[in-house]
Amino acid sequence: MVWLWTLPWTFILVALIPLATAKSPDVHHSLQQLKKRDDDSLRDENCQAWIAPVWPGMSHMMVAATRAERDVSYNVSIDQLTYKGAELTPLVFNKYGYTQDGIFKSMDLLKSGMTSLGLDVYWNNKEQYWQLCPVIFPSSAEPGTPVLLQRRLTTDIVTCDQNATLSYFLAALSNHVNVTDNNLDVDLISLKLNLRTVETPIQSNSSSQRQKRQFRETSTSVTQLASSVLSSLLNASKTTRMESTGSFSNSDSNSSSNSSRMSNSTESTRTTSSTESASSTSTTPSTYTTGPQMLGNIVGSSYIGPRLYTPKDLHRDREAEPPRTYDYQGLSNRGFPLAHYILLEMKARVMVSISQNDQPDGYGWGSADQDVIFTKQALLGSSDPENTNENIAYENLQECIRLDPQFLQSINLTGAASWRTYSSTQQDPISNVSFQEFINCGLSPSINNTLAPGETLQGLMTESLWSWAEDEPSKCHNESVTRTQDRNTGLVAWNCAVLMPDGWHVANCYDTHYPLCRQGELAYNWAVGTQKVNYFDTAQEKNICPPGYTFSLPRTALQNIAAKITVRGVSGKTRVYKGGDTTDPDSYDTIDYGNTAFPVWIDLNSISQEDCWVSGGPTARCPYRTVQSHSVSVALLTVASAVCAGVAAAIILLQMDTQPIKKNSGRWRRLMSNFKKSEYESVPA
């Protein structure tokens, strides 16, 4: 009998072990009732840490905002995404030199949120290799020792190191890809190459010797550090770091072949003879179609090679049945694949394209280049990356910035264009304000100018999102903005998003707003809902949207602009179609939207888990889960096992403790028998 009683408890304890060892996510943390405070404010002790700037890198707030914007754009073709770009020559190399330290600073731009880098590469026709330094190295230059060289075209003095090669840059880029190769941080990087011809230095070898001695003393520690970091880069590229449960890793075959690829490319890109004079010239063939010196071979055989999305991949995806590419009308064999497909299925991370081609002397574009690097030429009837005019300027850009309804008349033509880019110049520089405006209007700006005094890349990157407004998604809210009816019940949940004229804001899910609705699959056709509801009621079938419309959210910058313009045009008493015969007056309702319909709900929330913004209604689940360390799991399992062992020991001891035999049991039975005899068996008189 004791075992029958203990058996259910044993099963219960066994079932509790997995619960004890798993770290429960912070689900519905913000849905708890808010305690009233005397200062009538909701203060988050982590508020300052949430918004604190980080460099290189992003604040916790920017990380959450960038991830949310990336996630809602997963089902968008890659040519419709906005890329934050920077030209490395004016922003990095002019300041830090063409050195290994300069390459590390370039990777810092990617950590801060940049997704497009412009790199100048110079063809040395005499030595037959590509280099990052714009000037030919003198014969007396030693690898690892920076030298000062003067350019002929601009007369600028540049600092160059022979160890800072194109292969080294690609290895550093591969290391960044490995570090961010997880579901939380993965993104698509665009590497735009500008093909130039190397210049002959102005100064003589004797002056170069003096400058070399001047630099040698100060550069020794930097060279040693750079060499050790290069070794770590190459080692890190062989084993992919796992940072989340959805981490990606290269296949074993790719990892095993990378070492030989890197060594071959390094040897092939450097054929310089230290005994030859820098001023000597040689005649070489003007066109190459094969060989290790080809730019495509250098890029393809580098450590980043297995993570490239190439023209050959695009051709294969377009020729598939059905095609895996999309244009503005849907499936098309002339479009581009979705971001989700490239990042999560193909596990590709980098696209290399030619932004500017100065036709370097002695170098011809060959088949090896065309298979790896995208060009501006048309391919299979469609445009390749960067196949738009540099310095593109919309005639209606001001209409977009002003949220002018006239912009909707041309937005479909604008959305049909691929790879919409804008590159600044020193004469027409990009500032913090214009950077934000270009991104909001669906352009991918590239900074090709030095920043003005008072402007920093960190300040510029805080204005680099088309989705969230400034300082959003915020954890610092004031309870005074909560509606009166919500204050009476204390129901506050800052886990839902609304659309405002300046972008997305975090709002209380229990507030009532009109929902934002989209017409079918039409990207730029939006409408305001027909009734005010709290966010949780958007999942109910209450006809909250006009017929043919559903509750949704913008997934691109142009969709966001179209939604803003639509909502801004709704105010006062408005006739809204509710279904039926369009000629019947009874098929319309009159809704009073007041002075403005803003704010409106969008299909975005972090209800399932804090800081994890997902679409799909209030019941949508976060696709990421918290990964805890092995030591924590062992500790929790030890505690659970100890509790189970203690309970089991107690059960065994109770079973062994049987009822003792009473020695006077016979006497007790005799007393009970005599007592029964003395009782009457009938009713007494």
From Swiss-Prot:
Source superkingdom: Eukaryota
Pfam families linked to this entry: TIM-barrel_MTC6
Record's compositionally biased regions (Basic and acidic residues): 310-324
Disulfide bonds: none
GO cellular component terms, A-Z: membrane
Glycosylation sites recorded in the entry for this protein: N75, N163, N178, N205, N235, N254, N258, N264, N412, N432, N448, N478
TM regions (residue ranges): 634-654
Function per UniProt: May be involved in telomere capping.
Family label: Belongs to the MTC6 family.
UniProt-recorded name of the protein: Maintenance of telomere capping protein 6
Organism, as annotated: Yarrowia lipolytica (strain CLIB 122 / E 150) (Yeast)
